[in-house]
Amino acid sequence: MEDARGISFITLMIIIAVVSLILRIAVEQIIKVTVAQNESGASATLKLISTALENYAKDNQGAFPSNFSVLTQNNPSYLDKDYLAESPFKGYNYSCLRLEASGYSCSANPTSCKLTGTMVYTITTGGLLVWEKCESNE
C-alpha cells in the first residue's frame, strides 16, 4: 500500500509540473499578443493624432494648435477623444512635449516596458514616425 501512495504522489507532482509549464507558455503567448496589439494601436493612434494636427494647421494658415484639447473642441472635431488626457490608453501613455504654432512632437510610451509594449513611438511635424526599444528599469 505504501508503494501505491508513493506512486500517486509522484504522479500528482508530474501532473502539477506539466500543467505549470503549459500555463507558463500560455501566459507568455497572451503577453506577446497583447504587446503586439498595443504597439499596433500606439503607432496608429499617433498617426491619427498627427493627421488631426496637420489638418488643423491646414485650416489655420499653417499654424498648429498650442493646446491639444482644441482638436476635440471644434465642431466638427479633428479627433474623437483627447488621447493625452485619457492616458494611459491601451497600454500606452501619450504626450506631446512640443506643441506650438510651428510644429509638434508627440510620443507614445508603454505603461510598463516589456509588459504592455516594447517600443517607444514618436511622431513629429509632417507625420514622421520613428520608434526605438523601451528601456526597462528592472
Please describe what each predicted stretch is.
Residues S20, R24-P76:
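Conserved hydrophobic/amphipathic alpha-helical signal-anchor segments
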Residues I7-I10, I16, T51, R98, ...:
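Generic hydrophobic-segment detector
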Residues E2-I30:
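N-terminal single-pass transmembrane signal-anchor helix
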Residues E54, K58-G117, T125, K133, ...:
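Extracellular/periplasmic head regions of type IV pilus-like filament subunits
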